[in-house]
Amino acid sequence: MNKILIFASSVLFLILSSSFFIVKEGERGIVLQFGKVLRNNELKTVVYNPGLHFKWPFLETVKMLDARIHTMDNQADRFVTKEKKDLIVDSYIKWRINDFSRYYLATGGGDVFQAEVLLKRKFSDRLRSEIGRLNVKEIVTDSRGRLTTDVLNSLNKGSMNLEKSSLINVNSMNALGIHVVDVRIKQINLPVEVSDAIYNRMRAEREAVARSQRSQGQEKAEKLRASADYKVSIILSEARKEALIIKGQGEAEVTKLFAKNFNKEPDFYFFIRSLRAYENSFKNNRNIMLIDSDSQFFRYIKNMINIKNL
């Protein structure tokens, strides 16, 4: 009897534990009955909010789905602009589930990886289409906000305006039970080969500017040097002129003094002049002079010889 009671209690406990389930905060639960999504009388999917809930044991199973916002980083990819120029765009998407039944069916059982594969594919197509309508300047400046807004709207609504329609556009993320919350572009870069070409062109332009600046500097230096040389030549010329004037004035003063003293002491004047003449004449021992011995030139030498012989 005790064994039967224990067995019955165990079965009852198993049934009761299988009859209740808890949905955690940040999750939503959907019940599958024989593998199919459980719907209410209005044929809408029954979604269980956080809390304790009942289900039929063994007949129904519960699938928990993450109701929080997901962030999906996209690998940097190459896109072509309206000008047929390549850009490397790095971006990310924030999304959440807005239709748990459709999401469960579209992703093969609520697989997040499968959902993001489908989302990346649609996002890449929409971003490629939007970038193809813009030029580089519009993308990297004031059009970035409009670009991401257009991509966001096209992902949520598709290519058709269904605001007044109850149908789900198969081109929108609603077909996957997903709502895209935000789209952001992290970086926009040029391809490596384009960046290298631009860098080389900029370097060539800078080198050309540097050569031009150096050439202009050398030209200015030559002009300054020529101007300085000209000023120096003028200063030297003025100095020589002034020196010659001073020298002439000095010689004139000397001549004037000699003339004045000559009148007073003519013999002394002739004596000094003769000494200077002797000095200039006999500087070089190789000089040969043919002069009459009775010439006045040798008068003082003769006097010195006569004085010596006395």
UniProtKB/Swiss-Prot annotation:
SMART domains: PHB. It holds the Pfam family Band_7. InterPro entries: Band_7, Band_7/SPFH_dom_sf, HflC. It is a single-pass membrane protein. The keyword Transmembrane helix applies. GO terms for cellular component: membrane. Keywords: Membrane, Transmembrane, Transmembrane helix. It comes from the Bacteria. Belongs to the band 7/mec-2 family. HflC subfamily. HflC and HflK could regulate a protease. HflC and HflK may interact to form a multimeric complex. This is Protein HflC. It comes from Buchnera aphidicola subsp. Acyrthosiphon pisum (strain APS).
